[in-house]
Amino acid sequence: MNIYSIIPLLSENENEIIEDIAAQHAGGVADCFLFSMTLAPKGTPPLDLAGGLCARYRRFKAALDARRIPNGVLIQASIGHEYYQNSTRDFQHFVNLTDGQTTNTRCPLDEAFLSYIERAAAAIAGEHPSLVMLDDDFRLMAARRGKACACPLHMKALNALLDAD
């Protein structure tokens, strides 16, 4: 069995965080420590969030690798959550099926969004973490208000499957 501990990727108190992780590891609290990276796009054009987060992770990784403490990344809020307020207009947003309201979540069918998240994932992979865990952002049906995405991209895909216009 593996036990993971999720660590906020903070830039302050790095030494204290590293010592706390080392104590948790030595005490058997967890055997791998995952640093949380929130990648919900922000800004227009979208900011390179992964680049800055990877630079911060790199410092923790070097210190933990030197102590042979397994560490990795939790990719959090990659398509966004309704409560994140940001101004990205470059991507198709989730459109609620039930009421047609646009949310602050990105549609995973959007090629531009896929390119953004692919670059972010490549940056994270380039750091060679022991493990990468993906948050459950892709629960596009039951757990989201509106029950499903009815954006133009999803409607086009659905119509193609149904051979309809």
What are the roles of these predicted feature ranges?
Residues 2-12, 39-54, 99-118:
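The substrate-binding groove and active-site-proximal loops of carbohydrate-active enzymes
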Residues 2-6, 32-35, 71-75, 132-134:
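Hydrophobic faces of well-ordered beta-strands that scaffold small-molecule active sites
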Residues 7-11, 37-40, 76-80, 137-139:
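Active-site beta-loop-alpha junctions enriched in small/polar residues
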Residues 14-42, 123-131:
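Catalytic domains of carbohydrate-active enzymes, especially glycoside hydrolases
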Residues 19, 23, 55-66, 115, ...:
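Alpha-helical scaffolding segments of alpha/beta enzyme cores, especially the outer helices
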Residues 38-90:
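Aromatic-lined substrate-binding rim segments of carbohydrate-active enzymes
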Residues 72-127, 136, 140-165:
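Active-site-adjacent "subsite" loops/lids of carbohydrate-active enzymes
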